[in-house]
């Protein structure tokens, strides 16, 4: 299933995470709460911890086999006692309803051969007043120098994993099909993202 490729992408993207965390913090607008990062492309959560954005941290890990990698990443980041790794699936089984203030799901719509993003599940786990940042890209604050440094290798790895490009129109259709009962804003600054506020 390409777990080694996914792990390489996650490590390659390390320099992006602090800038992406800044973008997320700007949208989230607070510093407390439970933060969860969903899926195989988790990593920005370590920058959220460093920046003090949130007071409880969870990685909802899938596909199976990525959890051990994230536990090792937490050790390397000195965050072992601060982060909980939960083996789950795109439906977020094992994650309680209305338990999350901030949800981040990178790579959500671009890897249909690996998983289908479940926006209804993301919405389900958000607390009232919670925010989800779902999609993909470098975020609006990542400098061009960082992007150009990892761009080609990241592109190659993504293609090997079956990455597809989707348009904003297709994304809007997917949002409609998810039947989440709130307005979801699509932003294209620094990637293609869906911002869900509950």
Q: Which residue stretches match the model-derived regions?
A:
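A short SAM/SAH-binding and catalytic strip from SAM-dependent methyltransferases
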Residues: 101-116
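Core SAM-dependent methyltransferase catalytic element
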Residues: 174-198
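A short acidic, Gly/Pro-enriched loop at the edge of an enzyme's catalytic core
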Residues: 91-103
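Short alpha-helix
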Residues: 160-179
């Amino acid at each position: 299933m390409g777990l080694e490729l996914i792990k390489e992408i996650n490590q390659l993207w390390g320099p992006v995470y602090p800038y992406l965390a800044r973008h997320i913090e700007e949208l989230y607008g607070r510093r407390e709460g439970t933060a969860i990062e969903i899926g195989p492309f988790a990593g920005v959560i370590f920058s959220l911890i460093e920046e003090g954005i949130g007071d409880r941290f969870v990685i909802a890990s899938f596909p199976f086999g990525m959890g051990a990698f994230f536990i090792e990443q937490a050790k390397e980041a000195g965050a072992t006692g601060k982060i909980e790794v939960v083996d789950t699936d795109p439906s977020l089984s094992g994650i309680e309803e209305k338990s999350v203030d901030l949800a981040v799901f990178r790579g959500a719509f671009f890897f249909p051969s690996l998983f289908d993003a479940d926006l209804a599940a993301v919405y389900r786990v958000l607390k009232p007043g919670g925010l989800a940042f779902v999609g993909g890209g470098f975020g609006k604050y990542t400098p061009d120098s960082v992007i150009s440094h990892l761009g080609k290798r990241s592109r190659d790895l993504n293609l090997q994993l079956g990455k597809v490009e989707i348009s904003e129109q297709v994304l809007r259709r997917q949002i409609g099909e998810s039947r989440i009962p709130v307005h979801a804003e699509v932003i294209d600054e620094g990637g293609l993202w869906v911002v869900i506020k509950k």
